[in-house]
Amino acid sequence: MKKVLVLLSSPVAKENSYSTYFATKFVEEYQKINQEDEIKIIDLNSFDVSQKTLTSGNFATFFNENDSDALINELKSVDKLIVASPMINFNVPATLKNYLDHICVANKTFSYKYKAKGASIGLLDHLKVQIITSQGAPSGWYSFSSHTKYLEGLFNFLGIEIAPSIEITGTKVDPKPKEELYLEFEQEIIKKASEF
């Protein structure tokens, strides 16, 4: 039995969110194949820690036992991670960024020790992540920004194995109901869920 943690981050209402909808469908397909796995879903919009932003005023206390350590210990206790994120102003939502700020802690999730100068080692190398992203613009429209690449790079930095990402793009340029759009991605979702 594997333990799976799912992070939903869209500030869009659940019934209107593409990233949440596609992540939910992915989890449903995954559960069909892995019925014994334990799945925990966290909506970061209603998660206290993800409301806390790192500032100069709280830097000394931000990475604390009740917040950072608890989240890191949870990540160390699970086998797989599913992260759903829309693009908000060319980046991930603030709630997800706040969560990531809490877990990126030197000598806990990454380290510069025991590596060549200028290199690092990720300490979450037991984990595998499935990234599911959505954005209003088609892929490649904005070369200066890719929230998918940002997440892939960050999780790679932490030593996490990255499954091929699922990118739902162009949702505002060629608007379709999410249920209709899902039909275009259904086989990809089923395939990637079976391989995850």
Curated annotation (Swiss-Prot):
Keywords: Flavoprotein, FMN, NAD, Oxidoreductase. Transmembrane segments: none annotated. Binds 1 FMN per subunit. It catalyses: 2 a quinone + NADH + H(+) = 2 a 1,4-benzosemiquinone + NAD(+); N,N-dimethyl-1,4-phenylenediamine + anthranilate + 2 NAD(+) = 2-(4-dimethylaminophenyl)diazenylbenzoate + 2 NADH + 2 H(+). It is an enzyme of class 1 (oxidoreductase). Its EC number is 1.6.5.-, 1.7.1.17. It holds the Pfam family Flavodoxin_2. Homodimer. Quinone reductase that provides resistance to thiol-specific stress caused by electrophilic quinones. Belongs to the azoreductase type 1 family. This is FMN-dependent NADH:quinone oxidoreductase. It comes from Metamycoplasma arthritidis (strain 158L3-1) (Mycoplasma arthritidis). The lineage of its organism: Bacteria, Bacillati, Mycoplasmatota, Mycoplasmoidales, Metamycoplasmataceae.
